[in-house]
Amino acid sequence: VFVVIIPYRERLTLTATGPSHILTTSSVRCGYKRTIERIIIANKTAARGTVDIYLGGYGYNHYVYPTLTLSQAWQHFLTSDLTLREEETLEIALNGLTAGDEIEVLFTGYDEPLMPV
């Protein structure tokens, strides 16, 4: 019995058109779970805005991490790994932006089957 580990990398970008936006990751496919090891985020335009991370899926949004104030430098967001179940997503809620702000969020981790192969 061995476990197949599939690297997970996702990049979300946004050019703000107003003060608030939500970015959503791809959902975890059926039969798998996803471990997020790192989230880094930057407002590449200016040091302004805030971000909250929510776990979404199955009709709910669960607040995951405390509010972070954005800067132009890359900021690490996680203090420990985060595990998502089938069909769950992460939602990045951005507030306090100005139209034209360029936001970039990078996720790294891995997917693995719920049942060993």
Segments and roles (model prediction):
Residues 60-64, 114-117:
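Short aromatic-acidic-glycine turn motif
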Residues 23-26, 74-81:
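Exposed aromatic-hydrophobic patches
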Residues 1-34, 38, 44, 95-117:
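C-terminal interaction-tip segments
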Residues 14-21, 69-75, 87:
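Solvent-exposed, conformationally flexible loop/turn segments
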Residues 81-98:
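Noncatalytic modules at the cell exterior or secretory-pathway interfaces
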Residues 10-13, 62-70:
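Solvent-exposed serine/threonine-rich low-complexity stretches and specific carbohydrate-binding patches
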Residues 46-63:
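Short, surface-exposed beta-strand/strand-loop-strand elements in extracellular ectodomains
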Residues 28, 68-70, 84, 97:
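Hydrophobic beta-strand core residues of beta-sandwich domains
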